[in-house]
C-alpha cells in the first residue's frame, strides 16, 4: 500500500504518511526475518510504484544434445541466458536481445516451454519481497558466436548429466529438464503453474 501511495501521492502530506507506512512495514518485516530494517527499506525503495510481478525471460538453446548456459558474474554460477524483460519489448524481442547480449548468439524463438511462478521454486536466494514470473522459450541459433560479456564472463554448452553449479533463482534443473522434453517432443504442451 505504501509503494502505490508514494507513487500517486498528491501532496507532501500524503508523501509523509506513505513514507511512514513504508517505515512501519519495514520494521514489521525485519522483526519476522533475518534482515535489518535498513535492508528491508532499501529493498522496498528499489521497487517504486504499483507492485506487480516482474517478468524474467530465459532461453533454452539445445545444440548437439547440450544446452547453452552462461556463467553469471554476480554469483559465479550458471544459468540459461536471459533476464528481466524491458518495458516496450515483446517477450520474444526481450529474449532475443538477452541471448545476444549474454552469449553472442542470434536466435529465433521456436515456442514457449513454460510459464513458471519463480517464487514457488524452493531456494534461499530469491527476492524475498517481490514476485516474478519466468517465461522459458525454446530457441534455435541463427548465427553469431559464443562470447562473454560484463554480466556473463563465460558461455558453454552442457549435457543434462554434466550441468555446472546453477544460479538457482535464475535457472533450476527442473526447467532445464522441461526444455529437453520440449525439444524432443514438439507436441508436448506448455508447462504452466
Regions from the PLM with identified roles:
Residues 5-8, 28, 62, 97, ...:
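Short alpha-helical scaffold segments that flank and stabilize functional sites
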Residues 41-79, 107, 111:
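N-terminal strand-loop-strand
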Residues 85-109, 117-175, 191-192:
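Unchanged
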Amino acid at each position: 500500500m505504501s509503494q502505490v501511495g508514494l507513487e500517486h501521492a498528491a501532496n507532501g502530506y500524503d508523501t509523509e504518511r506513505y513514507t511512514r507506512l513504508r517505515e512501519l512495514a519495514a520494521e514489521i518485516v525485519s522483526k519476522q526475518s533475518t534482515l535489518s530494517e535498513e535492508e528491508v527499506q532499501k529493498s522496498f525503495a528499489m521497487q517504486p510504484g504499483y507492485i506487480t510481478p516482474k517478468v524474467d525471460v530465459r532461453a533454452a538453446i539445445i545444440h548437439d544434445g547440450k544446452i547453452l548456459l552462461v556463467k553469471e558474474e554476480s554469483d559465479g554460477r550458471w544459468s540459461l541466458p536471459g533476464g528481466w524483460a524491458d518495458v516496450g519489448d515483446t517477450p520474444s524481442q526481450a529474449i532475443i536481445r538477452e541471448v545476444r547480449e549474454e552469449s553472442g548468439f542470434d536466435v529465433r524463438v521456436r515456442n514457449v516451454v513454460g510459464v513458471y511462478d519463480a517464487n514457488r521454486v524452493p531456494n534461499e536466494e530469491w527476492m524475498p519481497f517481490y514476485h516474478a514470473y519466468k517465461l522459458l522459450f525454446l530457441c534455435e541459433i541463427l548465427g553469431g558466436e559464443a562470447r562473454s560479456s560484463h554480466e556473463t564472463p563465460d558461455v558453454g554448452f552442457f549435457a543434462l548429466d554434466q550441468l555446472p553449479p546453477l544460479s538457482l533463482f535464475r535457472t533450476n534443473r527442473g526447467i532445464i529438464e522441461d526444455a529437453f522434453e520440449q525439444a524432443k517432443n514438439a507436441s508436448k504442451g506448455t508447462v504452466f503453474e
